[in-house]
Amino acid sequence: MGQGLWRVARNQQLQQEGYGEQGYLSREQSRRVAASNMSHTSHRKHVQGGIDIYHLLKTRKSKEQEGFINLEMLPPELSFTILSYLNATDLCLASCVWQDLANDELLWQGLCKSTWGHCSIYNKNPPLGFSFRKLYMQLDEGSLTFNANPDEGVNYFMSKGILDDSPKEIAKFIFCTRTLNWKKLRIYLDERRDVLDDLVTLHNFRNQFLPNALREFFRHIHAPEERGEYLETLITKFSHRFCACNPDLMRELGLSPDAVYVLCYSLILLSIDLTSPHVKNKMSKREFIRNTRRAAQNISEDFVGHLYDNIYLIGHVAA
């Protein structure tokens, strides 16, 4: 970005000193007139002994013109893709170069909604003086604040009118963004069980295999590093949600939320057993089937075997 700004300033300086396009053409015309007055022999010798100065200058001019891409000449979708890789600081610098594009409200609206998929303010009439560029800066500032102190971050969003003071709205905001630090988010959800309840209901596990659904769940709601009450709460909530999303499958397999709870715990223990380098004697498929069916009766042996194969081939469910 710094190189691009330097290039713009340098081009302006060259134009002031007479090195713009008009200056270049006038000097080039003088050189060509002088070259035509040279003798055929000396000119031929010059061309053979060195580089064609006209070709060199023409190549240099074309390179200078092509050295910096004008985003206004690109399709809006491609421009949006390029600028979506920039953070707030770089976008501010970009606005100095691409002022019209960087101040486009549609661009900032797209950046806001692609990074923070849900905000309460999206569904409200915008207040006087509202701009998506300003909103992007506030969302970025609020995310950084959350990653330092979750409660202060949520309060910041509410003070700016970005989020309503509602567990459901906070849960939707968390579900639709990946800018929040997962360790801070885990602490926040452990303290705000009302937000956790609404966050769980946003997941749709319909027609998903149990281990894959559990992986998706733990990608959004990270599991604690140690066993305890919070992990039990997460598995309990997941089990009820999984059964609610797959009622036909539960009837077919004869599974209840309690049985799914047992299977989830078995999958977590199996994941640790198969992936930990400290465990020398890995659990076999036969042992897993026997232990699981002992804890949860009336479960198909083939179904439990497929659970083992999934962990063995794909890996940890809570990594």
UniProtKB/Swiss-Prot annotation:
GO terms for cellular component: ubiquitin ligase complex. GO terms for biological process: regulation of ARF protein signal transduction; ubiquitin-dependent protein catabolic process. Keywords: Guanine-nucleotide releasing factor. The keyword Ribonucleoprotein does not apply. Residues 146-276 form the SEC7 domain. SUPFAM superfamilies: F-box domain, Sec7 domain. The keyword Ribosomal protein does not apply. Residues 68-111 form the F-box domain. May promote guanine-nucleotide exchange on an ARF. Promotes the activation of ARF through replacement of GDP with GTP (Potential). This is F-box only protein 8. It comes from Bos taurus (Bovine). The gene is FBXO8.
